[in-house]
Design a protein with these regions (language model features):
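Polar low-complexity intrinsically disordered regions enriched in Ser/Thr and small residues
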Residues: 32, 59, 92-95, 99, ...
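Active-site loop segments of alpha/beta catalytic cores
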Residues: 1-33, 76, 85, 110-353
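Segments that shape or occlude catalytic/ligand-binding pockets
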Residues: 32-68
């Protein structure tokens, strides 16, 4: 009897023998805005990944982006951080930092976790009902933090240069702020644990192009204890920890696993596929973030297929341990989107055929 999507995901994560590679496709709002009907023509030919998609579902004249993701838009989140959109369909930047001056900390009010997520309101009763409905349908129960829940939130609040100085000088108020953010996030984590989730995601970008942003020593001092505090209750209940981070993080990957991460969503070519194999394969499940800097946006369809095949052959196994994620952003042309979707479909069951 074939596995359900939920069973296959969990077996893949646990490396106990799945039947296909779980694959996740994210089409950015910017790509929708750029390609429109040309994108529709691609997606309609991939019902395996987009089973409910039909031409004409989107009204492009009425398409509106959240101010956070709209060129010229301004948005103040529940922490008081001010966001400005730069490009339609891509999340903007924070350039208003409510704790830029530490003197503001005494009067600073955290969001209320009972009613407020960082980016908007929350109705926990409604979410509980949604989770119950998903459980009844046999679906994977997944949840997670907002992107940028701790390290990035710190520089949203303080400003990047200020945060780097805080870490380097051992500013005592920094630990106070970290504890405040962790306490706020713990409430959210516990709500989902009480709902019986299968996997919980912690997402933020810890890496730059060639190395992690703060390095192993500063990560161990400032961030790892907070990660452990948030992740260990999940692990104690048998919940998988999915950790997304863009950028190079191989210099802190051991610490991430020690904190509790069981599924590492990391970028492929920044680290090198062979390095990922040598450092991670068999230790943690790899949710491979497929290149969106060179081959997929700028390569040929043949180069794209060769990349996907090589990654599946190198990192995959009949035991599982490999998932794949592709985020599609400009300037990826329609033919390359088609190529990456075709290749992902072609090699999804490579290890079981």
């Amino acid at each position: 009897m074939a596995l359900s999507d939920r069973e296959n995901y969990l077996r893949t994560a646990s490396m106990t023998g799945g039947e296909w590679i779980p694959m996740h496709i994210v089409v950015s709002g910017a790509t929708w805005d750029q390609l429109r009907e040309d994108l529709e023509e691609v997606l309609v030919h991939h019902p395996h990944f987009f089973p409910d998609f039909e031409r004409g579902q989107r009204d492009y004249d009425a398409m509106q982006f959240h101010p956070q993701s709209r060129a010229g838009g301004e948005f103040v989140d529940n922490y008081g951080c001010v966001w400005h959109g730069e490009v339609d369909g891509i999340v903007g930047i924070v350039d208003g930092h409510p704790l830029e001056d530490w003197d503001a900390l005494d009067g600073f009010e955290m969001p209320d976790p009972r009613t407020q997520l960082p980016l908007g309101p929350v109705d926990w009763d409604r979410i509980r009902q949604q989770m119950a409905n998903r459980r009844q349908r046999g679906e994977l129960l997944s949840a997670g933090t907002e992107h940028g829940f701790l390290f990035m939130r710190l520089y949203y609040l303080r400003g990047f240069e200020n945060l780097m100085l805080d870490m380097a000088t051992g500013e005592p108020r920094l630990q106070q702020l970290i504890d405040m953010i962790v306490e706020y996030t713990e409430y959210q984590v516990q709500q989902y644990l009480d709902m019986g989730v299968d996997v919980f995601g912690f997402a933020e970008d810890l890496g730059a192009q060639e190395k992690s942003v703060i390095g192993p020593r500063m990560f161990e001092r400032w961030i790892a204890p907070a990660y452990t505090r948030l992740m260990q209750p999940c692990r104690e209940q048998g919940v998988h920890i999915h950790n997304h981070t863009d950028g190079y993080v191989m210099d802190i990957i051991d610490q991430l696993i020690d904190c509790g991460v069981t599924i590492c969503n990391i970028q492929d070519l920044i680290h090198g596929v062979e390095t990922i194999r040598d450092e991670l394969k068999g230790r943690a499940c790899i949710d491979l973030d497929i290149d969106r800097q060179s081959v997929v946006p700028h390569g040929t369809p043949q180069e794209i297929e060769e990349l996907i095949e090589y990654e599946v052959r190198t990192l995959g196994s009949p035991r599982g341990g490999l998932m794949m994620t592709i985020g599609i952003y400009p300037p990826t042309p329609p033919e390359n989107i088609d190529a990456v979707l075709s290749a992902m479909r072609k090699y999804q069951r490579f290890w079981w055929e």
